[in-house]
Amino acid sequence: MGKILLALIRLYQRFSRYTPPSCIYTPTCSHYGYQAIAKYGAFKGTWLTLKRIARCHPWAQGGEDPVP
């Protein structure tokens, strides 16, 4: 399951190159998701990614937010 999620993230990243960047964090949310799933597996990695996406909004401070 993790490999499928990682492939979907890579597919998203491939197509998102053609849109303006909107993530205020470093690494970007998609890269964070890829790292989290690769490190923690499908379930915990997806949970961390969803929490990160919820924090990524125009009123957030942004900045460095590495995978724990």
UniProtKB/Swiss-Prot annotation:
Keywords for this protein: Cell membrane, Membrane
Membrane topology designation: Peripheral membrane protein
Cited InterPro entries: Membr_insert_effic_factor_YidD
Cellular localisation: Cell membrane
A single Gene Ontology CC term: plasma membrane
TM ranges: none
Pfam families (alphabetical): YidD
NCBIfam families xrefs: membrane protein insertion efficiency factor YidD
Family: Belongs to the UPF0161 family.
Function, as annotated: Could be involved in insertion of integral membrane proteins into the membrane.
Descriptive protein name: Putative membrane protein insertion efficiency factor
Organism of provenance: Herpetosiphon aurantiacus (strain ATCC 23779 / DSM 785 / 114-95)
